[in-house]
């Protein structure tokens, strides 16, 4: 059993032995600290019972249930300074609001999926509006940053790879923090190269 707490704390519990160990990936010597979301995405691969994917601002893979980890991506975010982004229409002083105190660290991966039909076909979504795709288990990445009808920098709230067609993936975006409650639901039929909106007649304030 795997359990997660805030900011990337990850544990594995063996129900037979009672063993409970911390398996959170750590940065290597000389590397920058990792940026974990409040609820960092964890995926158990549908292609191997021992393979896990876990994401901070980089994506990690384990092939031994978390005993060891390998980084399979660079930083997949825009690497923006949150203090240079507008809040309520203008750039605020760092101490003006609690954006650096009781909130998630900005610039991390918040959505993650592996195709159940194609091992190593990975989809990553970030809190700063990117969808990154790898078709080879993380060796190469293809960046998507513009999506029809979706405002720039919108939080990628969910990614779902189709169980019926390896080329199809669905994405949902959430922009309520900017006072925008529109539903943003998209589909790609070419592994994230292009997207169309499938929000249809969902309620205007349906987030």
Give each language-model segment a name:
Residues 1-207:
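Beta-propeller blade termini and top-face loops
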């Amino acid at each position: 059993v795997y359990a997660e707490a805030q900011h990337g704390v990850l544990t594995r519990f063996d129900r037979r032995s009672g063993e409970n160990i911390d398996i959170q990936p750590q940065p290597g010597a000389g590397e920058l600290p990792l940026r974990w979301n409040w609820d960092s995405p964890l995926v158990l691969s549908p292609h191997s019972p021992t393979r896990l994917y876990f994401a901070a601002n980089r994506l990690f893979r384990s092939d031994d249930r978390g005993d060891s980890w390998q980084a399979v991506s660079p930083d997949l975010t825009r690497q923006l300074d949150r203090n240079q982004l507008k809040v309520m229409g203008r750039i605020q002083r760092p101490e003006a609001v609690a954006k650096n105190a009781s909130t998630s660290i900005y610039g991390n991966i918040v959505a993650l999926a592996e195709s159940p039909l194609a091992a190593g076909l990975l989809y990553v979504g970030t809190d700063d509006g990117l969808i990154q795709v790898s078709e080879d288990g993380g060796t190469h990445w293809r960046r998507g940053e513009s999506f029809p009808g979706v405002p720039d920098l919108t939080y990628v709230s969910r990614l779902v790879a189709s169980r019926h067609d390896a080329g199809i993936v669905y994405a949902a975006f959430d922009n309520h923090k900017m006072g925008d409650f529109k539903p943003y639901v998209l589909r790609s039929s070419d592994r994230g190269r292009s997207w169309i909106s499938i929000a249809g007649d969902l309620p205007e304030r349906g987030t």
